[in-house]
Regions:
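Exoplasmic/lumenal beta-rich domain surfaces
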Residues: 1-20, 128-143, 259-281
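Short beta-strand elements
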Residues: 43-53, 174-221
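Extended extracellular/luminal ectodomain segments enriched in beta-structured repeat modules
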Residues: 20, 223-233, 245, 291
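Aromatic- and Gly/Pro-enriched, solvent-exposed loop/edge beta-strand patches characteristic
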Residues: 242-318
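Beta-sandwich/jellyroll recognition modules and their flexible linkers
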Residues: 1-121
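Short beta-strands within extracellular/lumenal beta-sheet-rich domains
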Residues: 7-10, 211-223, 279-280
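A short beta-strand element within beta-rich, extracytoplasmic domains
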Residues: 227-240, 298
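Short, surface-exposed beta-strand/loop patches at domain edges
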Residues: 38-44, 299-345
């Protein structure tokens, strides 16, 4: 089954062989090893006495339930040289933060701060220390959403004197009652502006592949100024069988009538399986200049599943295309491929 929400489970530990000082326990899952399947998460673990199997008491807690979102409208990350002077076009007007309240309805204070090199350069809200909101309990409304009004983003939120790249830390904080569980009241994300474009957040919850010889996969990107494509980063998660001996044609297409058109570049490579979610960088033998919109992807030379990493927390389907022999079509699998083109003028 596919479960999208947490469910509560009560396990009684009442056998004498467990009732001793320094008792320990662990959780183990049974999973399919042929792919990124059977993922599950443990949220709260409460060990207490005098509970029974029908106990419904939960931890009194208000917490963040999703990662801190990117402030960019189209990409998760992008080059600094393409962001500067295009802030209005590239930044979201607002973001949404979801909270879950396991206890009774309560008021919480929310704020976010932006740091560069440990120096705070921006604070939300613009007036006052924090924004106070009433968060109803989860059983009444589900997750609380900051939609009325949303959390605003100003065009000067990322202000830096750096010329080529910049890195910012975004800190989200909720202020709750002193009795509230405190280890999940702050979340961070790093907003990077380096040399690559990325729709993904760097974590593969799944994988995507086409097992058809000659099939093509193309990912759309847009440049705000002419630039030189020097490399492409890809993340191929290790599945049941290694495919690092199977070649594919890394391909760059021009945009023609809204779809991949003329091939601008093609070079043969093979998947490289890395550890710890590290991307492998494919350096082009002949870097070349690109203007405007283009596509990055590959053409298959076999019917093997190459399986590019798929980030399911960020959806970029409108920029993801495949051609299995019947023309270009948008991918119907929600997520974003873990493919990142790298640019620099030098």
């Amino acid at each position: 089954t596919i479960l999208q929400d947490f469910t509560k489970v009560v396990k009684l530990i009442n056998e004498s062989r467990f009732l001793f000082d320094s008792f320990q326990f662990r959780f183990r899952n049974y999973a399919t090893i042929s792919g990124n399947f059977d993922h599950w998460h443990i949220d709260y673990v409460k060990l207490d006495e005098f509970l029974n199997s029908t106990d419904t008491i939960q931890l009194d807690d208000v917490s963040f339930v999703y990662p801190s979102p990117s402030f960019l409208k189209r990409y998760f990350e992008m080059p600094w040289t393409h962001f500067v002077n295009n802030e209005i076009m590239e930044l979201k007007d607002s973001i949404d933060i979801n909270l879950r309240n396991n206890g009774a309805s309560t008021n919480v204070d929310y704020q976010y701060n932006v740091f560069e090199n440990s120096n705070q350069i921006f604070h939300y809200p613009l007036i006052g220390l924090s924004r106070n909101v009433s968060v109803l309990d989860y059983d009444s409304i589900g997750n609380f959403s900051f939609t009325n009004p949303p959390i605003s983003i100003e065009t000067n939120v990322f202000n830096s004197f750096q010329l080529d790249s910049a890195t910012f830390i975004v800190q989200n904080i909720i202020g709750t009652a002193s009795s509230d569980y405190k280890y999940n009241d702050t979340i961070y994300h790093t907003q990077k502006f380096h040399t690559y474009f990325a729709y993904d957040d760097g974590v593969a919850e799944s994988a995507y592949g086409i097992n058809i010889d000659g099939a093509k996969l193309a990912y759309e990107f847009k440049l705000n100024r002419p630039d030189t494509l020097r490399a492409v980063q890809m993340y191929f998660p290790q599945m049941l069988d290694s495919v690092n001996h199977i070649p594919f044609d890394l391909t760059i297409w021009a945009k023609t009538n809204g779809l991949p058109g003329t091939i601008l570049y093609s070079e043969s490579f093979s998947p490289v399986h890395t550890e710890y979610l590290d991307y492998h960088t494919y350096y082009l033998s002949q870097p070349f200049r690109i203007v405007g919109d283009f596509y990055v992807g590959w053409q298959q030379t076999t019917d093997d599943l190459l399986n590019i990493g798929l980030d399911k927390n960020n959806t970029a389907n409108s920029y993801m295309y495949y051609d299995a022999g019947f023309g270009w079509t948008n991918s119907s699998y929600n997520g974003s491929w873990m493919i990142r083109p790298i640019f620099s003028m030098n």
